[in-house]
């Protein structure tokens, strides 16, 4: 049915269990925006001050780079990272994301630390490209999904993945 699905999101703001179905071909593009960081800070009921904002930004940016780094081993590995991150962060805030959490996730994935170190420099360039593409699309809200069909494109702003998957499943049945 679909030729491509691009999903822009921010870590700690989404539920990633839906993406592990392998039914639809998703390209996950993390972005870090000031609004998303503010939303994360508010969702976790953290102090509303500049110091906390900067700390949340730092942790979200670090986790995003770590996800991008692991994703160089393949999209499936990247999705497994997101699911492991969700599991590790239950009952915690983004401020709790530290190297110990990363090491635990890499261990769960049987991901070689030397491969992580080797790919890390490329993650920053990949994140910059993802951010640029997000802004080129003229979008301002997260999450946002672009579904590129054979003859059409659909933009879905600020909907939970469960609703997007329901829509895609209905479209697949119609075809």
Regions flagged by a language model, labelled:
Residues 3-23, 99-175:
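C-terminal cap of thioredoxin/glutaredoxin-like
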């Amino acid at each position: 049915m679909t030729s491509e699905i691009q999903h822009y999101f921010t870590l700690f703001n989404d539920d990633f269990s839906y993406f592990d179905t392998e039914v639809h071909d998703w390209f996950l593009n993390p972005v870090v925006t000031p609004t998303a960081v503010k939303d994360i800070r508010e969702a976790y009921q953290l102090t509303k001050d500049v110091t906390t904002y900067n700390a949340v930004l730092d942790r979200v940016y670090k986790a995003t780079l770590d996800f991008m780094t692991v994703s160089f081993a393949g999209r499936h590995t990247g999705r497994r990272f997101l699911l492991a991150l969700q599991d590790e962060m239950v009952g915690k805030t983004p401020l709790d994301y530290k190297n110990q959490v990363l090491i635990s996730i890499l261990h769960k994935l049987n991901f070689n630390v030397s491969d992580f170190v080797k790919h890390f420099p490329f993650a920053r360039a990949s994140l910059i490209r993802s951010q640029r593409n997000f802004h080129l699309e003229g979008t301002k809200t997260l999450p946002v999904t672009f579904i590129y069909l054979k003859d059409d494109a659909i933009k879905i702003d600020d909907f939970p993945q469960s609703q997007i998957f329901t829509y895609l499943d209905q479209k697949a049945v119609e075809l």
